[in-house]
Amino acid sequence: MFYSGLLTEGGRKETDRREAASLRQQRRMKQAVQFIHKDSADLLPLDGLKKLGSSKDTQPHNILQRRLMETNLSKLRSGRVPWASKTNKLNQAKSEGLKKSEEDDMILVSCQCAGRDVKAVVDTGCLHNLISLACVDRLGLKEHVKSHKHEGEKLSLPRHLKVVDQIEHLVITLGSLRLDCPAAVVDDNEKNLSLGLQTLRSLKCIINLDKHRLIMGKTDKEEIPFVETVSLNEDNTSEA
């Protein structure tokens, strides 16, 4: 009887341990299910939970996907303004870079006009000589300016320049040559003077890019060295 009681007590303890382990396992599973359900409930709106059914579109996973997509679209729409601002800044920087590149590609030569040293642009892309209003003011040539006679005629000019007046006799000293040539006055803030193709042809000019020289004349040739474009704006500012 004594041994039987020991066996019975041992079997009861084993049974209790198994039941306790089973209860712990059930509690863990219940907690896991509650956690998953709570996590989904936190992500889903209450109206979405009420409408859950057998349809695939009303399952938690699909509702979450739709909500996530709507949130991303909303963020994308709200982010369009700063993106547009970045694009504008990028375009502005690109425009400034192109302008600087154009200035670096200019061919400049030193000359004299109205007793002042001037950097003139050798412009083979324009037929006419051009001088800006700013350059006219700087050189004191206002009294030589006349109204543009051919108002109905639109000159072919680069960079969408607008002719406002003209100078019939613009005296320019280029090397040892003294030129008396017409020039169109353009509405431009830059203090530029440019020699057009018409004048360059009359001087029988050759542009030597290897030697960086403007060669004038056919028999008695004269070479005018190019001017560095880097100092153009600084020279214009100091001369103003």
From Swiss-Prot:
UniProt name for this protein: Nuclear receptor-interacting protein 3
Annotated GO biological process: proteolysis
Organism, scientific name: Pongo abelii (Sumatran orangutan)
Pfam families linked: Asp_protease
Gene3D superfamilies: Acid Proteases
InterPro entries assigned: NRIP_C, Peptidase_aspartic_DDI1-type, Peptidase_aspartic_dom_sf
Alphabetized GO MF terms: aspartic-type endopeptidase activity
Stretches assigned to coiled coil: none
